[in-house]
Amino acid sequence: MKGLGSTIVRSLPNGARLVCADNTGAKELEVIAVKNYSGTVRRLPSAGVGQIVFVSVKKGTPEMRKQVLPAIIIRQKKEYKRADGTRVKFEDNAAVIVTPEGTPKGSDIKGPVSKEAAERWPGVSRLAKIIH
C-alpha cells in the first residue's frame, strides 16, 4: 500500500451503502468500520477513495449475504481534488471485496477505478479495465 498525493474527501461514513463492483456474488455493501481510523469523540468514522473499510454484504448470493469482509473503495460520488488541481467525481459509490492483505477476491472489476485506488493497491489496478 502506497501513500496518496492528493487530498481525498472522506465522504462515506459508517452506514453508507456501496455498490459491489466485482464478481464475488455480492451486490450491495454497507460500511460498518473504517480500518486505521482515529477520530474525534462522537464523530462518525468515514472513508474515501483508496481506503480499506469493513463491510457487511446486504444484497447478493445466499453464500455471501450477512458476511463481514474487508473492501477497498474505488469510486465515490463526492468530488475530490487531485494534486494537479483537477476535480474528480463518479456516478456512484463503489467498492471491491478483498482479502485482509489487499488482493481482490473477484476476478473482474466492473466500471472505472479511480487513479488513487489503482496506485495504492496494485492488485486492484491489475483487474481494472478503466482507470480514471
Curated annotation (Swiss-Prot):
Q: Might you name a Gene Ontology BP term for this protein?
A: translation
Look up the record and report any one GO term of the cellular component aspect: cytosolic large ribosomal subunit
Which key words tag this protein in UniProt?
Ribonucleoprotein, Ribosomal protein, RNA-binding, rRNA-binding
GO MF terms on file?
Answer: large ribosomal subunit rRNA binding; structural constituent of ribosome
Which SUPFAM superfamilies does this chain map to? Ribosomal protein L14 (SSF50193)
Alphabetized Gene3D superfamilies for the sequence:
Ribosomal protein L14
| Pfam families the record matches | Ribosomal_L14 (PF00238)
Q: SMART domains this protein is in? A: Ribosomal_L14
Report the sequence similarity comment from the record.
Belongs to the universal ribosomal protein uL14 family.
Q: What does this protein do?
A: Binds to 23S rRNA. Forms part of two intersubunit bridges in the 70S ribosome.
HAMAP family found in the cross-reference section: Ribosomal_uL14
Which PANTHER family does the entry link to?
50S/60S RIBOSOMAL PROTEIN L14/L23, LARGE RIBOSOMAL SUBUNIT PROTEIN UL14
What's the subunit arrangement here?
Part of the 50S ribosomal subunit. Forms a cluster with proteins L3 and L24e, part of which may contact the 16S rRNA in 2 intersubunit bridges.
Q: What is this protein called?
A: Large ribosomal subunit protein uL14
Provide the species name: Methanococcus vannielii (strain ATCC 35089 / DSM 1224 / JCM 13029 / OCM 148 / SB)
Name of the gene this protein is made from: rpl14
